Structures are given as C-alpha cells and as structure tokens.
Amino acid sequence: MFEKIAIIGGSGNVGSHIAFLGAMRHIAKEILLFSNDIPRCKGVGLDISQAAAIFDIPILIKGCNSYEEIAESEVVIITAGFPRTPNMTRNDLLLKNASIIQEISSNVARIAPQSLLIVVSNPLDAMCLVAKQWSKFEKERVIGMAGILDSARLTYESKVMLGDFNKHIQSYVIGSHSDDMLPLLRHCLCEGKVFTDIFTPKMQEELIKETKGGGAKIVNYYQKGSAYFAPASGVIKILEAISTLNEEILVCSVFTEGEYGIKDIYLGLPIKLGKKGVEHIVELPLNQQEQEMLNISTQGIKEQVEILKDNKLLY
C-alpha cells in the first residue's frame, strides 16, 4: 500500500475512476485529486470518500488545485489533457496535450522529486517522452499505461470469439498505442495453448482488427470523450504490481535503449515492475515478420517526436 498518490486531472473521467478503483482496492492511505475545476474535484473526492465509508475503508481523498499539495506523493498519475473525439486521431492531440504534460512534469519534478510518474494522456508514447524530458526523471520512473489496455482488449475479443468468458487468457499487445500496435498472437495463451494453434488465420485477422478498433468503437458510442473504466483499471494494475512486487509481466510504455533493436523512444513492451518503477524489459523472441511490424509501429512515434522537437516541446 502507498502512503500517498496524486492524480493530475483528478476531476476527469479517467482520473476520477482511478481514484474510485484505488479507494475500493485500498491502494493508498491518501489519494490527492488535482484539477483546475476545484468544485468538481472536491465533489469527486467527497463522493468517493462516502463510497469508501460504506465498505469501512480507511482512506483520505481530497481535491486541490495547488501543486504544493502533491508533495511527498510516491506516485503521480497524469491523466490531464484533451480527450479524443469522433474522427480525431491521436496526432491531432499531439501539440494540444504536449504543452500540458510539459507544465505538469516540470511542477511534479519540483514538488515531488522522488515520485514515480504514470502517464495516461494521449498520444501516450510521445507524452511519456515529454514527461521524462521535462521532469528529468530516470527512465525507470516514467511509465505509460496503454499496453495493458490494448492487451486487455485482445483478451476480451478472444473470449468473445471463443464464446467462453471463463477461460484464462494471457495476451500481449506491444508497440505504439495506435493503429500500428502489434498483437503478438504467437505469445498469447489460452489455457496454455497459443492463439495461433486455436484460431484460424481468418479468426486471427478478425481478432487483430477488433483489438485495434476497440478504443475508437467506445469513442463512437460515447460521442463525447473516450474510454475511462478500462484505462483506470490499467493504472490500478500498475500500482498493484509496484506495491505488491507480484512479478507479473505487464505491457507498458517504457523508454528503450536498444531492446528489440529500438532506441530513444517510448514504446509498449513487456516489463516487470518494482518499487523503483521499471525493473527490466522482457524481450520475447520475435520472428522476422513481427520485428518488421514492430519497427513500423515505431515510425509514427518518431514522427511525433520530430514534430514536438520542431515546436520546442522536446529537445
């Protein structure tokens, strides 16, 4: 259990659901909700506090709009930013959200210099690099939540296709948090059997299509905003892995230094987490086609990085 965590963007859909799930699972003794919309932020904090009281969970949840109050937070979760709307690509969000992440990261480094940073804002992989550079934190302490979500969508779609929600499934979707994500069907398991032995080639194509379209489908249903229950759950999964040292392999956006032949960008890869953040990146054996697809997956991120450099949001 953490002593204190802070959620920047705590009044938004993702931030408030992280707080609610975190309270219900008693992830911390104190959860701080930071937002410019202080009335809503305080309302969310009070509402969740009353929910926690129903289950007699001893937790302090409060809203604030001063960075000074995030001092001594062990983890700071960044959900702030503009959400995707119908027909909006992640690139459309790039410059809009990068300036927000720049400001937040600089303030977190000033007020909570020992914290871990978990980034949820999109475009995820590029925002992680912005957060790392402007916080000046070690690469292990800046983690992006996306691969857990993409992998969960593959797990869900495979259960739908099998018509059996009782199956134990382990899925890995690596690469960028975009349409270029790479579901590693050869490494995904259902009751110990690999997906490529269970699903026909046509079924595999359908699984990949549905997984990649999972987020956009929710955006189209909601019309205003994007997914928040599942992303919030992904953050809690990271927090629990850090606090319990459960050794579970999770796909998160992490800084690369040659792993999988990729350097100097954030990318969704399998990792193990510990008290100090990323302990190590797990390198699954890829065949030539998978490696080529992973390389393609990095191109969009690299293009975003160049755009951010041109606009002085990265250096």
Swiss-Prot record:
Cross-referenced Pfam families: Ldh_1_C, Ldh_1_N
Transmembrane segments: none
Coiled coil: none
SUPFAM superfamilies linked to this entry: LDH C-terminal domain-like, NAD(P)-binding Rossmann-fold domains
Active site positions, chain numbering: H177 (proton acceptor)
GO terms, biological process: lactate metabolic process; tricarboxylic acid cycle
UniProtKB keywords: NAD, Oxidoreductase, Tricarboxylic acid cycle
Amino acids binding substrate: R84, R90, N122, R153
Entries under PANTHER family matching the protein: L-2-HYDROXYCARBOXYLATE DEHYDROGENASE (NAD(P)(+)) (PTHR43128), L-LACTATE DEHYDROGENASE (PTHR43128:SF16)
Stated family: Belongs to the LDH/MDH superfamily.
Record NCBIfam families: PRK06223.1 (NF004863)
Name of the protein described by the UniProt record: Malate dehydrogenase
Organism of derivation: Helicobacter hepaticus (strain ATCC 51449 / 3B1)
